[in-house]
């Protein structure tokens, strides 16, 4: 066991794969976020160690939007000894000259754009009335959607009251390491990183990771329905979002074509690598759009990119 302190209260059989694929059932905090600053890594880890999962580990997929930071971050720390921010800086940022940081230095605070964001715990799910519709009148996808609306897993995962005091524009948030949610950097650096990964994981003789590892990490290891994201058929590799089957006309989801891997952010930002075309792409923004059009801008850019490639 890499992390024996975690194995209690129904989490004893959690696997590393469960943590990497959003199947640990720990997509939120049972008793809200620890009331401390974001830099108090141990407080968040301890809260997750002690609590029960919302769903049995391995039984279902539920997007661990923020808790992924400490669940996978602590696992990395236990194995390697470094925090995610330290690891990324030493293994990726410095060697590749990337302007991307997990745990921002105070001297760089003036370079950050102000972020406009919306409270998500007050969000009413689309078609909220579906919870009153008898299941025999619904198809399988709508039944999955109904179950997620009733379970309120979305609210458990995205409860953001803690952001009222220390939101995305606070010094506390920007300088802390919350590696699933608060990376700070440029679109160019993200596109560069994914471009290198999409071209053999090597640049100027500098090998980042073994190609076999990336191949394994970017194949589908978990499929929806995702209990947090309203039953969506989201595919995950190890940490990465990978090729999706959503229509490119639906702007509440990002476009991820075959042989692409990357991730999307709740504000509408997207970064991915394309193994087929050997390119990296990134779009970052500082304003959160309406849920129905969350990825509209990025999707328009993605479509334009592939029109050029095709």
PLM region spans:
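Flexible glycine/proline-enriched surface loops and loop-helix/loop-strand junctions
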Residues: 51-58, 68-70, 170-179
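Structured C-terminal helix/loop/strand segments within mature extracytoplasmic catalytic/sensor domains
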Residues: 264-310
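Short, gly/Ser/Thr-rich active-site loops of penicillin-recognizing serine hydrolases
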Residues: 178, 199-202, 218-226, 291-310
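Active-site helix/loop module of the DD-peptidase/beta-lactamase fold
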Residues: 1-27, 31, 49-50, 78-132, ...
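Alpha-helical scaffold elements that line and support the substrate/ligand-binding pocket
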Residues: 19, 48, 64-92, 96-97, ...
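Active-site-proximal alpha-helical segments within enzyme catalytic domains
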Residues: 22, 71-75, 177, 181-203, ...
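Active-site Gly/Thr loop motif
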Residues: 118-187, 219-276
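Short acidic alpha-helical/loop segments enriched in Asp/Glu that coordinate divalent cations
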Residues: 203-214, 229-231
């Amino acid at each position: 066991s890499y992390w024996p302190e975690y194995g209690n209260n129904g989490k004893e059989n959690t696997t590393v794969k469960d943590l990497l694929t959003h199947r640990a059932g720990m997509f939120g905090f049972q008793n809200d976020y620890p009331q401390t600053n974001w830099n108090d890594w141990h407080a968040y880890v301890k809260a997750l160690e002690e609590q029960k999962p919302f769903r049995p580990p391995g039984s279902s997929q539920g997007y661990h939007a923020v808790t992924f930071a400490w669940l996978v971050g602590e696992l990395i720390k236990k194995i390697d000894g470094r925090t995610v921010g330290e690891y990324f800086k030493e293994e990726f940022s410095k060697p590749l000259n990337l302007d991307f940081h997990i745990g921002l230095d105070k001297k760089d605070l003036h370079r950050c754009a102000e972020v406009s964001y919306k409270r998500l715990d007050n969000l009413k799910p689309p078609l909220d009335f579906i919870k009153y519709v008898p299941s025999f009148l619904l198809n399988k996808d709508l039944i999955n959607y109904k179950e997620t609306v009733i379970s309120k897993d979305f609210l458990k995962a995205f409860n953001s009251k803690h952001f009222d005091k220390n939101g995305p524009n606070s010094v506390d948030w920007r300088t802390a390491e919350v590696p699933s949610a608060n990376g700070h950097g440029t679109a160019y650096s993200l596109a560069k990183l994914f471009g290198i990964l999409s071209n053999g994981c090597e640049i100027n003789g500098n090998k980042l990771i073994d190609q076999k590892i990336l191949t394994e990490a970017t194949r589908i290891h978990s499929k929806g329905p995702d209990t947090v994201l309203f039953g969506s058929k989201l595919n995950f590799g190890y940490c990465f979002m990978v090729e999706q089957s959503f229509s490119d006309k639906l702007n509440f989801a990002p476009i991820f074509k075959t042989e692409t891997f990357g991730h999307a952010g709740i504000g509408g930002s997207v970064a991915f690598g394309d193994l087929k075309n050997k390119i990296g792409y990134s779009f970052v923004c500082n304003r959160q759009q309406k849920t129905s059009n969350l990825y509209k801008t990025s999707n328009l850019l993605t479509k334009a990119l592939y029109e050029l490639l095709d």
